[in-house]
Structure formats: C-alpha cells, structure tokens
C-alpha cells in the first residue's frame, strides 16, 4: 500500500486504544465463529442426511413405541429397499454426566440402511456372533479411552430396569464417511435387549428407518405406510430423514433466530464502539489532516487514510477467528455427547472476515468522509 507506513504510524500513536479496539473485534469475531459453528451443528443433521431415507415413528410421540410386526409389512411396499429398526436405550456409563447416545439396532440391516457409517467387515462379523457385542463411534471411543475387546457396563434408566447393569463387549469401531457424520453413537444387538426387558417391550421398537430405491417416491411411500396403520392402536408418522431431523432441532426452539439476534447485537455494538474510536482519532488529528491537505494531499487520499486505518483494525481483529479455530475443536471434545461435533468450516471463517471488513468500512466511512470534506483553513486553526 502506497501510504501503508503512514497508516501504521497513525494506528500506533495510541497503543492502548489500538489494543482495546482490536480486542473488541477479536472477541466479536470469536463469538461470531462460535455462534456460526453451533448453528451449523444443529442444522447439520438436516443437511447431511440421505435423500433416500424415511423415518417412521409413532404418531403420538417418538417416545411411544410401534410394533416390530410392521417391519415385514413395510418392506413389501413397492420402492422400499431396506428397513431397520432402533430403540433408544437411555443408559448411563459411570456418571450421568457421561452422556452419549446408545441405540438398540437391527444388526442384519443396519449397514444397508446407513452405508456412510463404516465398520470393517471383520469387526462387524465378530459383532454379529457376539450376543453382548457393541459397535462404538470413534469419537466416543476416544473420549473414554476405550479399545476393542474392552468390557463396558452401562446402566439403563428406562424400560422398568432402573439400575440394571448391562455388560457389553466392544467388538468394533465405526467411522463416518464425512467429517460431519455423527461418530458418538453406541450400538448393540436387538436380541440381547429383547431377552432382558419386560414382556411388554419385547415386540416393540422405537422407530423404523427405511431406505428407498428412488427419493422421488418418498411422498408416495410415506403416505402408503401411514395409511396402512390409520385408525390402528399404533398409528404412524412417516417423513423424510431431513424433515425428521429438522423437527428434532425445532424442539430446542428457534436456534437460528436466537443466534442471529445475538450476532446482530454483538456487531451493532462493535460498530458503535469502532465508529466512536475512529471519530475520536480523527478529531485528535484535525490539525495534522489540515497540514496534509495544505501540502498537496488530495481529499481522496485523506479518505483512504482513515478508511485504511479502520479496515486495518478490523483485519487485525481476525485473530479472534484464529483463536476460534484453535479453541472450538477442544470445546467440541469437551462437549462430546452433549452437542453434535463442532466444526469450524472455511465458509464460517470467510463469513467472519467479510463481516469484519463490512464493520471496519461502516465504522470508518463517516469519520473518513468528514475528514475528506474538512476545509484546510478550519483544520489549521488548531496549529
């Protein structure tokens, strides 16, 4: 930049104010990145799900069960390729704070319905032969320091089995095909679950996940399933996996609106703080700006000086994004099981830089315009 040294000299004339202003930007951009990551985490379920999967639950509520006998009936519907069933286990490992999702799965069809959750064949075959076997996501394995072959006790809190301890052998680890895939789950066999719960739960499942041949057939198949069980004791609600994930997120409230509201307040406050800082800086240098104009600097150069300072402060504040890049993965590990994986994407960082530039420009344009319009005679009165 032609006048870069002059801009830097003006920036460092008030070092304490410079540090505080950059710090304000850094904190705001860190919060921006954190809020963006949390928003992505909650909306990711709807973004990464497969278009060829449907979810069938009890129409009353997901906590109500549906009969296992529905499985074969649904499988006979034209367009249905595979179907698997799951139950929420609700177990506790050592301490209630050690939450992670545990599912009773149908091992015969799990991999066909969820091909993106990858388990090595040898580990899966061992799991199939082990009544007490379990497959665990890589994130949960790392979180607790488990390894294949470990025997893990988990107490359930539901099904009338409070404080009953189930023993599991870790037979394998699954990994997601993409970084955003959920690797925190714990799977174990339906047969082991069925033999341990009261009779009223033995023929009941929590929900079905259905893989279909053509995503375009999803509305027809969903309607067919629900019509089959209309007016039955166990009516169903079938929707795409994306719609199901969005409905689940909505139970937490309007996360996106909340995050947008917080972000707007933060950046509006930052705009006021930075704009006031630049205005004070221009007033303090009125005589210097007058001298620059008197010796031949054009008005546009003065405008560029002030805007350059404001944008330089904004870019320096992007250190907050770097801090977020380092801190959020550690936060994600600490919150494993409580929140979806927190991933700082290139898009989030790019939006952060753009937001910084916009605020930097907006906070500097009025003081810069005032300096540009300033008359030399008026400015030099203070000399």
Question: Model regions: which residues?
Answer:
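C-terminal membrane-exit region of the final transmembrane helix in multipass inner-membrane proteins
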Residues: 348-383
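Short helix-to-coil transition segments within interhelical loops
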Residues: 11-12, 282, 291-300, 374, ...
């Amino acid at each position: 930049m032609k006048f870069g040294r002059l801009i830097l000299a003006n920036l460092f004339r008030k070092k304490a104010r410079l540090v505080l202003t950059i710090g304000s930007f850094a904190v705001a951009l860190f919060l921006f990145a954190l809020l963006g990551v949390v928003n992505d985490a909650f909306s990711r379920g709807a973004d990464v799900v497969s278009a060829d999967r449907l979810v069938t639950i009890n129409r009353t509520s997901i906590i109500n069960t549906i009969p296992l006998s529905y499985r074969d009936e649904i499988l006979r519907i034209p367009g249905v390729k595979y179907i698997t069933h799951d139950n929420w286990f609700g177990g506790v490992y050592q301490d209630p704070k050690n939450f992670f999702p545990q599912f009773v799965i149908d091992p015969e069809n799990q991999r066909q319905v969820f091909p993106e959750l990858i388990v090595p064949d040898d580990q899966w075959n061992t799991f199939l032969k082990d009544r007490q076997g379990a497959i665990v996501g890589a994130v949960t394995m790392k979180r607790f320091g488990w390894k294949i072959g470990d025997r893990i006790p988990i107490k359930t809190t539901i099904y009338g089995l409070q404080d009953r301890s189930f023993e599991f052998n870790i037979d394998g680890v699954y990994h997601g095909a993409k970084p955003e895939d959920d690797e925190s789950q714990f799977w174990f066999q339906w047969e082991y679950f069925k033999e341990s719960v009261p009779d009223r739960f033995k023929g009941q499942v929590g929900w079905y996940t259905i893989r279909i041949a053509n995503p375009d057939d999803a509305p027809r198949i969903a309607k067919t399933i629900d019509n089959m069980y209309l007016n039955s004791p166990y009516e169903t609600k079938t929707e795409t996996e994306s719609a199901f994930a969005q409905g689940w997120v909505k139970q937490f409230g309007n996360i996106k609106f909340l995050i947008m509201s917080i972000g707007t307040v933060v950046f509006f406050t930052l705009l006021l703080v930075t704009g006031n800082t630049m205005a004070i800086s221009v007033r303090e240098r009125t005589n210097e700006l007058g001298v620059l104009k008197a010796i031949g600097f054009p008005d546009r150069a003065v405008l560029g000086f002030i805007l350059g300072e404001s944008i330089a402060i904004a870019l320096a504040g992007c250190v907050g994004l770097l801090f977020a890049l380092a801190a959020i993965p550690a936060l994600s590990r600490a919150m494993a099981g409580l929140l979806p994986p927190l991933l700082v994407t290139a898009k989030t960082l790019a939006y952060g830089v753009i937001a910084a530039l916009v605020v930097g420009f907006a906070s500097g344009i009025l003081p810069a315009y005032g300096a540009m319009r300033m008359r030399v005679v008026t400015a030099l009165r203070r000399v």
